[in-house]
Curated annotation (Swiss-Prot):
Pathway note: Polyol metabolism; (R,R)-butane-2,3-diol biosynthesis; (R,R)-butane-2,3-diol from pyruvate: step 1/3
Source lineage: Bacteria, Bacillati, Bacillota, Bacilli, Bacillales
Entry EC no(s): 2.2.1.6
Binding site for FAD: 162, 266-287, 308-327
GO cellular component: acetolactate synthase complex
CDD domains xrefs: TPP_ALS, TPP_PYR_POX_like
Region spans: Thiamine pyrophosphate binding: 399-479
GO MF annotation terms: acetolactate synthase activity; flavin adenine dinucleotide binding; magnesium ion binding; thiamine pyrophosphate binding
SUPFAM superfamilies in the record: DHS-like NAD/FAD-binding domain, Thiamin diphosphate-binding fold (THDP-binding)
Protein name per UniProt: Acetolactate synthase
Family: Belongs to the TPP enzyme family.
Keywords, comma-separated and alphabetical: Acetoin biosynthesis, FAD, Flavoprotein, Magnesium, Metal-binding, Thiamine pyrophosphate, Transferase
Reactions listed under catalytic activity: 2 pyruvate + H(+) = (2S)-2-acetolactate + CO2
Length: 570
């Protein structure tokens, strides 16, 4: 190629829309979720020629949830693309959820032409201002030449440190403008090293001199890139541990003896009492958004070792004695495991033994249970039996989420996905769609209540169109029960929680999905098996009896439960 030809090629002109797509290709994006509109249709048009694949959703919020699932499962930003006005504003809940829960997402939206931005005109909105409080990065591109810089920085910022959402707005005339601006390359994020040696040595000393050191694994500690190192530490040092809801999957089958369940939302679990008895707590990748430290360090007297990529968010109940700041697996691997000797005295051994027994008892369906509807623990048990350890299960928010989060064992990272930062209704089905694209051909299970189901049930059409192998289980009781049982506890009555019943089987069939119903608890295993063996999307209606829900928020700590364990353990 001659010099003149090279210069001519370097001056090839493209629309801004094509430059946006070139940026996505450079970042390795495989899917873009969204809904088109006039202010952004130039980008959708360019995607037709260059990729990535467009996944048309039925609501922008759900498109953001799908992108969030991709971000959580891959560690790379999922991408959502929408138009101006309500197209952009409908992203708010999805981006807030992703940003709060540490999931990388890049959202791109159209806007009115620059000349109309300050006018009271159709769909004019200060997009960047709208998303500034709920994202890590929110900008509007005012010059076509800045597109590569804005998009590339959005990807970098969404993934860096505490991952989250980034937003870029494009006025219509900017994406339609022609330019010879070159793209910029994707720049890999710098990799952190381990924490400082002296901090690691000090942490080892505190653990070795503790009477009952406990590991609290948070969401970053339970992610695929950290899990091998975390499990190795737990196995070598034989420390008891608990998971937050979003760290589900830290547990492996050979760590069952050291595992004391998950903690979150209500302070009444075996893991809560374990932390109550601990004198040293090592937190790994823990974020206070998962479970406020005031619930597990109520007196503020625990010795806390904070191991994370970012500094601790200081709180009256969270003032670490040591901070091990660095790459999580590198820091853990830098610990000389064989040098850490932990031996529990008879008192502590008794505490652990009694807690294990209490934990086991709490996982059983009551012996005197009688109902023509399934007990929550029956559903959890049969679902666990129906799926292998690598099946991704996405969980909506509601009473069912508490039962799933506490009792559904997860043995691989990110195989139980839950929204515990914002507790956003409607995430399960869109997340399952995103997961099915990350893991093509693999069965995905999603779980919701009948309340949360209708927040995003329109995406069943998306699942059918994609022939996604999703089994969605609806725990059906015609009530916003997570609100109801808390109202009963506070006021001895409920208000504004009841709604009408729908025929979930017919709803599924109207979209071209398979609809199944569990008519009695003894059918659970067979119906779940039938659903797992079916082709394409399946919706299973499971009538549930939530009579035991009133105990979910019981105040067992620090009084009754604490006294019970005190008499047993001491």
């Amino acid at each position: 190629m001659t010099k003149a030809t090279k210069e001519q090629k370097s001056l090839v002109k493209n629309r801004g829309a094509e430059l946006v797509v070139d940026c996505l290709v450079e970042q390795g994006v495989t899917h873009v979720f969204g809904i088109p509109g006039a202010k952004i249709d130039a980008v959708f048009d360019a995607l037709q020629d260059k990729g990535p694949e467009i996944i048309v959703a039925r609501h922008e919020q759900n498109a953001a949830f799908m992108a969030q699932a991709v971000g959580r499962l891959t560690g790379k930003p999922g991408v959502v693309l929408v138009t101006s006005g309500p197209g952009a504003s409908n992203l708010a809940t999805g981006l807030l959820t992703a940003n709060t829960e540490g999931d990388p997402v890049v959202a791109l939206a159209g806007n009115v032409i620059r000349a109309d931005r300050l006018k009271r005109t159709h769909q004019s909105l200060d997009n960047a201002a709208l998303f500034q409080p709920i994202t890590k990065y929110s900008v509007e591109v005012q010059d076509v030449k800045n597109i590569p810089e804005a998009v590339t920085n959005a990807f970098r910022i969404a993934s860096a440190g505490q991952a989250g959402a980034a937003f870029v707005s494009f006025p219509q005339d900017v994406v339609n403008e022609v330019t010879n601006t070159k793209n910029v390359r994707a720049v890999a994020a710098p990799k952190l090293g381990p924490a400082a040696d002296d901090a690691i040595s000090a942490a080892i000393a505190k653990i070795q001199t503790a009477k009952l050191p406990v590991v609290l694994v948070g969401m970053k500690g339970g992610r695929p890139e950290a899990i091998k190192a975390v499990r190795k530490l737990l196995k070598k040092v034989q420390l008891p541990f608990v998971e937050t809801y979003q760290a589900a999957g830290t547990l492996s089958r050979d760590l069952e003896d050291q595992y004391f369940g998950r903690i979150g939302l209500f302070r009444n679990q075996p893991g809560d009492l374990l932390l109550e008895q601990a004198d040293v707590v090592l937190t790994i990748g823990y974020d206070p958004i998962e479970y406020d430290p005031k619930f597990w360090n109520i007196n503020g007297d625990r010795t806390i070792i904070h191991l994370d990529e970012i500094i601790a968010d200081i709180d009256h109940a969270y003032q670490p004695d040591l901070e091990l700041i660095g790459d999580i697996p590198s820091t853990i691997n830098h610990i000389e495991h064989d040098a850490v000797k932990v031996e529990f005295a008879e008192r502590e051994q008794k505490i652990l033994s009694d807690l294990k027994q209490y934990m086991h008892e709490g996982e059983q369906v009551p012996a005197d249970w009688k109902s023509d509807r399934a007990h929550p623990l029956e559903i959890v048990k049969e679902l666990r039996n129906a799926v292998d350890d690598h099946v991704t299960v996405t969980c909506d928010i509601g009473s069912h989420a508490i039962w799933m989060s506490r009792y559904f064992r997860s043995y691989e990272p990110l195989t139980l996905m839950i929204s515990n930062g914002m507790q956003t209704l409607g995430v399960a089905l869109p997340w399952a769609i995103g997961a099915s694209l990350v893991k093509p051909g693999e069965k995905v299970v999603s779980v919701s209540g009948d309340g949360g189901f209708l927040f995003s049930a329109m995406e069943l059409e998306t699942a059918v169109r994609l022939k996604a192998p999703i089994v969605h289980i609806v725990w059906n009781d015609s009530t916003y029960d997570m609100v109801a049982f808390q109202q009963l506890k506070k006021y001895n009555r409920t208000s504004a929680v009841d709604f009408g019943n729908i025929d979930i089987v017919k709803y599924a069939e109207s979209f071209g999905a398979t609809g199944l119903r569990v008519e009695s608890p003894d059918q659970l295993a067979d119906v779940l098996r039938q659903g797992m063996n079916a082709e394409g999307p399946v919706i299973i209606d499971v009538p549930v009896d939530y009579s035991d829900n009133i105990n979910l928020a019981s105040d067992k700590l620090p009084k009754e439960f604490g006294e019970l364990m005190k008499t047993k353990a001491l």
